[in-house]
């Protein structure tokens, strides 16, 4: 499948800034997500923009997706709310008519919920540019609230790579293989073996 992917806002047109900088962190998630989807066999079209205004970056993103005849267009964001009280994950779709997109949205929301994020469910809008100006099924993923203490603490624990894994799994319907952690410190290995043998209290 050919997926048009945009990692949120342009470096020249910042998004929300709270405890986390949406633009900076979402770009980390994007950079981790691309190779995961490629490894799963998908072609990724970079729909990011360097525009210095919102209309410019939105238009450039959907234009790239349309010009490349993508099968799906996905943009990644972080949310924000007054006073930092909002929390959780939500996925926006044009409407509820596409079963595939509904399923992907539900899987993504469930993956985030399993890690402690609030599940805000599927949302629908016919007025959001990414959803109405794209000629293919599209989705806006609001991963979390960048100004909420709970959400940002989870993010610091999970990391951009972990967030990307949850999105990739939601899109593909398959678990993303975890990288094995290699213990390189010999002392740690020796102590572990001794403890298993009962030689160390």
Regions found by a protein language model. Give the residues of each.
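Extracytoplasmic/secreted envelope proteins and their assembly/folding machinery
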Residues: 30, 34, 59-62, 89, ...
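Sec-exported extracytoplasmic/periplasmic mature domains
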Residues: 31-42, 66-70, 109-117, 168, ...
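Short, low-complexity, charged amphipathic interaction modules
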Residues: 180-201
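Non-membrane alpha-helical structural segments and their capping/turn regions in soluble enzymes
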Residues: 23, 27, 102, 157-164
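Active-site-adjacent substrate-binding region
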Residues: 97-123
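Active-site-adjacent mobile loop/cap segments within catalytic or ligand-binding domains
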Residues: 4-6, 10-15, 68, 72-78, ...
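Catalytic-core regions of hydrolytic enzymes
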Residues: 2-89, 94-99
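Surface-exposed patches in mature extracellular/periplasmic domains of secreted proteins
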Residues: 45-50, 118-125
């Amino acid at each position: 499948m050919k997926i048009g992917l945009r990692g949120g806002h342009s470096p020249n047109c910042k998004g929300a800034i709270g405890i986390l900088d949406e633009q900076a962190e979402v770009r980390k998630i994007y950079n981790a997500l691309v190779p995961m989807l490629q490894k799963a066999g998908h072609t990724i079209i970079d729909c990011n923009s360097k525009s210095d205004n919102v209309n410019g970056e939105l238009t450039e993103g959907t234009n790239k997706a349309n010009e490349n005849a993508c099968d799906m267009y996905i943009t990644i964001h972080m949310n924000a709310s007054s006073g930092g009280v909002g929390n959780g994950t939500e996925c926006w779709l044009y409407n509820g008519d596409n079963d595939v997109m509904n399923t992907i949205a539900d899987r993504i929301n469930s993956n985030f919920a399993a890690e402690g994020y609030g599940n805000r469910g599927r949302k629908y809008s016919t007025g959001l540019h990414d959803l109405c100006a794209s000629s293919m099924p599209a989705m806006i993923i609001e991963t979390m609230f960048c100004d909420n203490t709970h959400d940002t603490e989870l993010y610091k624990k999970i990391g951009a790579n972990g967030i990307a894994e949850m999105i990739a799994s939601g899109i593909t319907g398959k678990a993303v293989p975890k990288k094995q952690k290699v213990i390189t410190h010999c002392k740690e290995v020796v102590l572990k073996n001794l403890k298993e043998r009962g030689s160390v209290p």
